Amino acid sequence: VPQMVYYVYAYTRLVADGTIKAGDKINVDVPTGNFGNILAAYYAKEMGLPIAKFICASNDNKVLFDFFQTGTYDRNREFILTTSPSMDILISSNLERLIYKIAGNDAEKNSELMKELTTDGVYTITDDMKAKLAEFYGGYATEAETAATIKKVYESDDYIIDTHTAVAATVYGKYVAETGDKTPTVIASTASPYKFTRSVMNAIDPEYDSKTDFELVDELEKLSGVKVPQAIEDILSLIHISEPTRRVVI
């Protein structure tokens, strides 16, 4: 429920900024593995928010992309560790709620499909159900594409995004190239670059890889102009040098 507020707030900001007029439709682009954040946007639309398209952005664990392409959800695949770990998921538990909706609120059908996922690792929705997914677009970004987008956004806009946001930005570019749809779009930035400092800084310049994690925090602050979050400052304050061994203790 709290995530629904993100999209209502973003819409009101677009109206206030003059980007759109009240009642105009927008698209939303969400990096997701568990399907929770984008489901919140879907529920916001059900409550009246004018959303035209839901762009579901996946990383290399592209089980959701394949589902929207084919109508088959198949978790029987290699699990890939990526630089956007919050999306490293093969069982998108919140997708069940959307399945229930497109099944016509048929709890029995929904239960049948979820049982197939548990026992066989795969299920396929009906053609009628798949037709109800027309407002969704599935896309994915590779690790190389994600890193390239971080670098591109920094160099073109002097703005630093995290790996998950970069997945969404990459997929948005693919969506526009494929469809030509220029509807104003909200890209959900779901994490701080400070949470994935090494991946972000290495994408900007591989030479940063020689620095320690805490040195990278300082470098990120210099590049971004954004103050180090208090939670990280608190961790830094716990570091001390143990005298006689000179070990760093956290």
Model-derived features: positions:
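Conserved active-site and cofactor/substrate-binding residues in soluble primary-metabolism enzymes
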Residues: 2-6, 35-39, 89-97, 141-148, ...
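Exposed alpha-helical structural elements
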Residues: 63, 97, 108-113, 145, ...
